[in-house]
Amino acid sequence: MKKIQVLLKPQCNAEIQNQFATKFGDQCEFTFQGKETEDAIVAAEVVIGEPEEEEILKAENLRWIQLTWVGVDKYTKMKAFPTGVTLTNASGAFGKIISEYVIGNIIALYRELPNYWKNKQKHLWVQNRSSETIYGKNILILGTGDIGRNIAHRMKAFETHVTGIKRTAVPEHLQQMKEFDEVYDLTALDQQLQKADIVIGCLPGTPETKGLLNYERLYSMKKDAILVNVGRGSLIPTEDLIRVLEEGHLKGTVLDVFETEPLPETSPLWNMENVLITPHIAGPSFGGNAEVQDMIWNICMENLERYLNGKKLKNIVRLKDGY
């Protein structure tokens, strides 16, 4: 029986290579990172990782791409993604670690930890007794996928009221997902923004979500609300956010993603004390966290097993929808 050609783009150690070979070696022939050749790309029926557009177009036998991250912007922007090629992502690997990032940074803002970090550098013992708590707050989560559900689940430990916003219409049986108290579609966004103490963006990047949190919507939020974005930078127009913050609106902002990355050195956001900035690391992939890395490989192996057995793959991306 002719073996299926599988190209693995990410760097993987000998242990992972052995796992693939032991589990699938009878049916697959693997080409690992660092050993790619023009012939291997052309022959590949399956690619695990993030191939470049020119590689996809060269892969004459390509049937399936398994991404090792969640975002698919790179492929939705392709002029002509090949018909007959299935794209799947690694949804399910990042929800836990991103939820910890979100909650940790909200607590940092509420307890004014950045000010204490600055005082530490100056050896200053200054007590600020004003502090906030997540307990009992109204939480609005934009996006009810793996990341949104994980954030909602952990927010419930603080006895919060958690509302979810889905991009698409909400079927009746989903209007109360177990992690959320309420779930609505985008038509309810304006009303829900006004109620929320904390707004968390984890929506995919699509034409419909681009610029969704514009100046008017940001300013409609409570003056002392906290805004977090761990989804896509296109959700929030940077200039609109800067304007709102300069006008003294919002208690603070946690930003891991931006319209332009890297964030330009000249951006006023860098100098705002109530803005916490990280360089798109809320959900670290390979080399960032061993548990996340294991979950990514488990997703890849489970889907490869499904592919070989003719079963439906998990995490199929709908390119026309952008996620």
Predicted regions and their residues:
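Rossmann-like adenosine-cofactor binding region
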Residues: A169-P268
